[in-house]
Structure formats: C-alpha cells, structure tokens
Amino acid sequence: MFFTCGPNEAMVVSGFCRSPPVMVAGGRVFVLPCIQQIQRISLNTLTLNVKSEKVYTRHGVPISVTGIAQVKIQGQNKEMLAAACQMFLGKTEAEIAHIALETLEGHQRAIMAHMTVEEIYKDRQKFSEQVFKVASSDLVNMGISVVSYTLKDIHDDQDYLHSLGKARTAQVQKDARIGEAEAKRDAGIREAKAKQEKVSAQCLSEIEMAKAQRDYELKKATYDIEVNTRRAQADLAYQLQVAKTKQQIEEQRVQVQVVERAQQVAVQEQEIARREKELEARVRKPAEAERYRLERLAEAEKAQLIMQAEAEAESVRMRGEAEAFAVGARARAEAEQMAKKAEAFQMYQEAAQLDMLLEKLPQVAEEISGPLTSANKITLVSSGSGTMGAAKVTGEVLDILSRLPESVERLTGVSISQVNHNKPLRTA
C-alpha cells in the first residue's frame, strides 16, 4: 500500500527488499504490509532557548547568557538525513530538541570561557558567530543544521556589568565636563582673537581706505592724462579715419566702375559667344554637314573610280593577254610565211627578190605620195615655161615614181631592171 508525508516529514522504509532502507522526504512510497516497516521522522524547525547560568569568563567573572537557536533535521541532504535517522529515528521532537540544546549549551559555555565580559558585552556579533560556527560543525554530524543563533541576554549577580556602566557613565560625564571647559576656554580665546582681529581689521581697513584714496587720486590723475591723450588721439584718429573713409569711398567707386566695366566686358563676351554659337548653328554646322556629305560623296566616287579602274585594269589585262595571244599567233603565222618565203627565195633567188620588190613597190609609191594626199591646198608657181595645172602636178609625181627603181637600188643594192633581164622564162 502507499504511504505519503508532507514536506516537513520524512519516511524510512525497511524490511524485505529494502536494504539499505529507503528514505523519502516529502513524498510517497509503496510499502508491502507485514514484510516491510515504515517509520517517520520530523523535519520541523526547532526553537531552542540556550541558557548558560553563572559561567566564568576568561578573567573569572561569572555571568549568565541566554541565546536563541533555530535548528532542524536537513531532509534535502541524503547523508545528513541518514545520520539523523540513525541517531533520532523513533524519538520525539522534544527528545531531539533536548539533545541539540545540550550540545549548543556546551559550546556556548566553551565560547564564554574563552572571552572576557567586555568582549561578550561589547561585541555580541562576534560571540554569536563563534557559537554558530562551533555548534554547526558538531551538530551537522548528527544530521542537524543550525539555521540561526542570536545572543538574547547577558546578566550577572555581582553588578559587574552595572559597574562597567557606571564607570562608562562617569567617564562620559568627565569627558563632558572637560569638553565643556575646553569649549568655554576655546570660546574665550576665540572671542579675544575675534576682538583683536576686529581692531586689526578696523586699522587695516582705515589704512586700506587711505591707500585706496591715494591710489584713487593717483589713478585719477593718470586717467585724466590718459583721457586727454586718448581724446587728442581720438580727434587725430577721427580726422585720419575721415580721410581713410574718403579714400576708401573713392576706391570703392573706382572698384565699382571696374566691376561695371568687367560686367560690360562679360556681357559683350557673352554676346560674342552667343553670336558665335548662332553663327555656328546657322553657318558652320550646315557647312560642316555639307562638307561631311561631300566627303562621303567623294569617298563613294573614289571607291567607284577605284572599282572602275580595277575593272578597266582587268579588262586591259585580259585584252592585253588576248592581243598578246593574237600577236603571237600572227607572229607564228608570219614566221611560217617568212620561212616559206625564205625557202622560195632560196629556190628562185633573183626571181623571188624581184617578186618581193614588185610586191612592195605599190606600198613605197603610196608612202611617197602620202604627203600629197594629206595636203589641203597646193599652190603652183610657174616660171613661164613648161606645162601648167594638173599636168604639172602629174608630171612631178611621175618623175618621182620614175626615180623609184633608182632609190630602191640605192637602198637595197638590187637593180630591178637587171633582175628583170636575167629572169628566166616560165614554161607552161
């Protein structure tokens, strides 16, 4: 069956299958009846009134001290809970409180024996801290933690503390009387010093007033001299300033004129620039556009001429090749003809020569009469004897032609008449 407990209580289950025993602080646990056992231990805080009656201090003065301590079994620490269960399981809260009280009282007595009455009385915090420290280290082994410790009361049966209070009161009263006398003395001294300082201050004040009056008179005279000097300087400076002002006004006027002239020049320059831009817009840009157009046309014509020239060059080259081929063919034909003529000349010799001369004579006669055919006008001058008119011209031509065989003989060394006489008769 299940058992539960609050946060101020712990349960310890022992018996079958519970070795070591199970400790649960503020929770629930399952217990098998008859074969398992459950026990509870309180975790409540215990308030202890620790009284130590007539304990002799370090100087042998017996006093009584009462302290208040708060202690409890620590359930969150498993080791301390186990130690508390070993020592206090089955005991009531009163029994646990009595054990803790006896332990605290013993430590409190030990601390009192090592301190004087004055130390305990004057420094209660130190006494409380020492008791808390020593008692905590001892009670923690029992599973009990000291939550707090405070010294509540100190008293004795021999009026030792009262005597300490009287002595302190007398000392305080003595110090008060001494302080009062010293204060009165200091007040008289300060009053005498104040009176002396007052007289000294009055004398010094009168001296200072005299010095001040003297300084005032001297400074006034100095100031008067300086004022007159400054006034004269001011008058002179005023005149100089007036002259400078006039000069500056004149300079400003000149500068204004210069600025106006500069502005006029700037306006004229702007007008010139505007006219130049207008001229450029109306004349230069169209001229440049026309020049650009003409340049493009010239480049186009140039390209066209180059193409035409290249085409003509190609045509000339092809024509030249054709003419060269024709000339070559004609030369070959003439060479073949000349070769045949040479063979015929070799065979017929003088007859062939005569045949060739007779063949060329018409051409020679044509060349001789060529100048006459190209003449536009012929003027005949007669000496009065012989024929006249066309008969005269015809006679001249015939005379030239009759001299043709003689010219051929001079040129070639061949006589036409001789070759003709020696020519053999052809047989049919």
From Swiss-Prot:
GO terms for molecular function: ionotropic glutamate receptor binding; protease binding. SMART domains: PHB (SM00244). It is a peripheral membrane protein. Keywords: Cell membrane, Endosome, Membrane, Phosphoprotein. Gene3D superfamilies: Band 7 domain (3.30.479.30). The modification Phosphothreonine is found at residue 387. The modification Phosphoserine is found at residues 19, 163, 385. It comes from the Eukaryota. It is found in: Cell membrane; Endosome; Membrane, Caveola; Melanosome. GO terms for biological process: axonogenesis; cellular response to exogenous dsRNA; dsRNA transport; extracellular matrix disassembly; intracellular signal transduction; plasma membrane raft assembly; plasma membrane raft organization; positive regulation of canonical NF-kappaB signal transduction. Belongs to the band 7/mec-2 family. Flotillin subfamily. This is Flotillin-1. The lineage of its organism: Eukaryota, Metazoa, Chordata, Craniata, Vertebrata. The gene is Flot1.
